[in-house]
Amino acid sequence: ISNPNNTNLSNTEMNDNKSNPIISVDEKRFDSDNHSEDYQAYENLVKKTIDYESLEVTHHDDMRQVDEIVNLIVETVMCKNDKILIASDWYPASLVKKKFLMLTYSHIEYVLHCMSGNTTKVKNIKKYLLAALFNAPSTMNGYYQAEVNHDMPGLVR
């Protein structure tokens, strides 16, 4: 007679399923072989493009945030995914990387200015910064023109 309450064997011991480990996002996004060398190269390129040394002088009190922005740009540029999520929309990674590698001192200054003027609660700062950086080249001039129009209405054409 077999014992229906046989607790000597676990169901998992008789399971023939093969292991399927979950790969974290970071493991999928980055190739670890030359990661630190590539990261350093992109970090140097980004710092040169945004004129990091000038930001250190003009935005000394904001350098922690500037460093976070640099890290976010480099992380995004090194992303191995085909698409990148920006402000609830998926964009081709090539477009996002191109825009991020074209960011300049003025764009970073604009993002810092927008961040300092923001009074609403930001739930996901990474998503917020990604969107601000991605949109900076397309919105910066319009933003400053609107500021001038507001401050000096006599100059409006």
State what each model feature region is.
Residues 1-80:
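Charged low-complexity intrinsically disordered patches
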Residues 67-99:
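Short, amphipathic alpha-helical segments
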Residues 89-157:
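Short, cationic/aromatic linear interface patches
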